[in-house]
Curated annotation (Swiss-Prot):
Organism field: Staphylococcus aureus (strain NCTC 8325 / PS 47)
Protein name: Methylenetetrahydrofolate--tRNA-(uracil-5-)-methyltransferase TrmFO
SUPFAM superfamilies: FAD/NAD(P)-binding domain
One GO CC term on file: cytosol
EC number: 2.1.1.74
UniProt: FAD binding residues: G9, A10, G11, L12, A13, G14
Family designation: Belongs to the MnmG family. TrmFO subfamily.
Record-linked PROSITE patterns: GIDA_2 (PS01281)
Subcellular localization(s) per the UniProt record: Cytoplasm
Gene3D superfamilies found in the cross-reference section: FAD/NAD(P)-binding domain
Gene Ontology molecular functions: flavin adenine dinucleotide binding; tRNA (uracil(54)-C5)-methyltransferase activity, 5,10-methylenetetrahydrofolate-dependent
Role: Catalyzes the folate-dependent formation of 5-methyl-uridine at position 54 (M-5-U54) in all tRNAs.
HAMAP family found in the cross-reference section: TrmFO
Cofactor(s) annotated in UniProt: FAD
Amino acid sequence: MTQTVNVIGAGLAGSEAAYQLAERGIKVNLIEMRPVKQTPAHHTDKFAELVCSNSLRGNALTNGVGVLKEEMRRLNSIIIEAADKARVPAGGALAVDRHDFSGYITETLKNHENITVINEEINAIPDGYTIIATGPLTTETLAQEIVDITGKDQLYFYDAAAPIIEKESIDMDKVYLKSRYDKGEAAYLNCPMTEDEFNRFYDAVLEAEVAPVNSFEKEKYFEGCMPFEVMAERGRKTLLFGPMKPVGLEDPKTGKRPYAVVQLRQDDAAGTLYNIVGFQTHLKWGAQKEVIKLIPGLENVDIVRYGVMHRNTFINSPDVLNEKYELISQPNIQFAGQMTGVEGYVESAASGLVAGINLAHKILGKGEVVFPRETMIGSMAYYISHAKNNKNFQPMNANFGLLPSLETRIKDKKERYEAQANRALDYLENFKKTL
């Protein structure tokens, strides 16, 4: 009789790990504290709830995360399967209806013959094979347990979610439908700003009241999900090179490029809700309302969910984990998700996929599974276990810079990325034969 594996946390990573194990005949206890105990950021009791954006980012193979998604798709990832089924229009990105996405994953796992769902808070790491995938909002008690077994102090930063608004309340005469550089379908509503409008908006952001942070917590942001008011503090031009970048978004009414653009992205399958792209924030709700109403087209907008901000937690992985996401000092324990230093929905799920496949192979006596570095999955696993500057280890998105250089140098960036993507998928196909 095979051993039962404990997977703690039913987020993206834990859900993927549990699924990979169960599909290989391994019995799994999937332990999730919600709804018994909620977090400051979650709104439901569903598995793999998306708490920041509803976008899983770029889908093209000229994009690092696009390659990662395709690798996972070929490895029967439950997260990518759900995303493909719950997809909503988003240009060249893969965005999903949050409810359909998490609902599909929840039902699939709850009905799997090899998975037992246990709703309770875990304060101590259980004996036996365990995958810890408790995510950025790990409870203080369990976080201390993790510190005790890793021997390292926690690292932490803040992650922020953007406001969501009702489409019906948008002044459609002031916005236009377009994707940047007309890539993919025209999927974004764009709110153009003149220089005067931008300056009024920018000044209001700087004066807006920020929600308080506990004095004992040092703020440490990851660039990929930084509050827009923090970006604004870096200088008047920072937003213009970030979420309000107008390049490739010429107004079809005038044929001219606006001074600044705020983009709205569809958030649900019905197309009734939109999120404000890149506007994750920690402003007080009243301040959010005042600032958002300065955006052309959103003067009378109805905000259905205000932006929120919450603490994230991750470990110094290069010192304590190997490429199989195993704890070097206690290989029966694995970590998965953002806690390992992978950053992003897809990256988190990919780490769960690696942990789950590896543990299944170990239990079934099939030997270890180390993905080739030429694959995006392998390069992420290599990064978290071999990062050179581990004294200042930082979370990392999937990107082509993590992959080994090509044997023949290609100057053109797009052609180089295409070559790296093709190589990654070739390596993956060969590697799959060993699984």
